[in-house]
Amino acid sequence: MNLKEFSKVVDLVRESNPLVHNITNVVVTNFTANGLLALGASPVMAYAKEEVAEMASIAGALVLNMGTLRPEEVEAMLLAGKSANANNVPVLFDPVGAGATSYRTEVARHIPAEIDLAIIRGNAAEIANVINEKWEIKGVDAGTGNGDVVSIARQAADELNTVAVITGKEDVVTDGERTIVIRNGHPILTKVTGTGCLLTSVIGAFVAVEKDYVKAAVAALTFYGVASELAAAKTVEKGPGSFQIEFLNQLANTTSGDIEKYGKIEELE
């Protein structure tokens, strides 16, 4: 595959400075906002039910993340999502911890039933639980399962009529027909809380400027993975604190040329 067509999306994000409306969790709010700013997007965190519909209507993308789940936030997510749908604003959903508790799983299945999603992004366990496939989960982490990640992703894309993104050691992007695997990234990402949540919001910035959502997601994942590799090369021996700071630097400094040089993607049959 031609990495150049994906790398161009990074430049487009930085030229366009898209507004990304995040209804995310309290653990990752600051990291998400700083990561989007470093990339070149414009983050807004608006949660009040009195304003979410209006804010979502003017955004380039809406990101719904249920990490620290409360009923009032679910209400706000539904209001924002329906407004985004009505105004042709792409909606991304991160079903954090789906399968961990019955309430969390119920919400993770209810939101896609009520809102048309451009992207759903999670680990294998989360996505499997959204579509009621058996996969063990540990807290909000992936746990273990016997399923085929590519098959789970394709099934989710088909059942939810969306682009499914499953992230892990390898990342899978599919709309049910096109399936692409991305092999960039670094294990130290798992030692910094919020890197998955930020990733969903970064995909949101890419989706805001590229309407081919498979292409946007692959571009975002490749960019994010390469940035993490470049950051780790400078800091991994120091530890996750140093990595987190350098990762923000690399979100600002990683170029389209870096993606073309270091990107590792494969389209599956």
UniProtKB/Swiss-Prot annotation:
Entry keyword Magnesium: yes
EC number, as in UniProt: 2.7.1.50
Keyword ATP-binding annotated: yes
Major enzyme class: transferase
Pfam families: HK (PF02110)
Gene Ontology MF term list: ATP binding; hydroxyethylthiazole kinase activity; magnesium ion binding
Catalysis: reaction(s): 5-(2-hydroxyethyl)-4-methylthiazole + ATP = 4-methyl-5-(2-phosphooxyethyl)-thiazole + ADP + H(+)
Coiled-coil residue windows: none
Family of this protein: Belongs to the Thz kinase family.
Function (record text): Catalyzes the phosphorylation of the hydroxyl group of 4-methyl-5-beta-hydroxyethylthiazole (THZ).
HAMAP family (UniProt xref): Thz_kinase (MF_00228)
The protein's name: Hydroxyethylthiazole kinase
The species this protein was found in: Bacillus cereus (strain B4264)
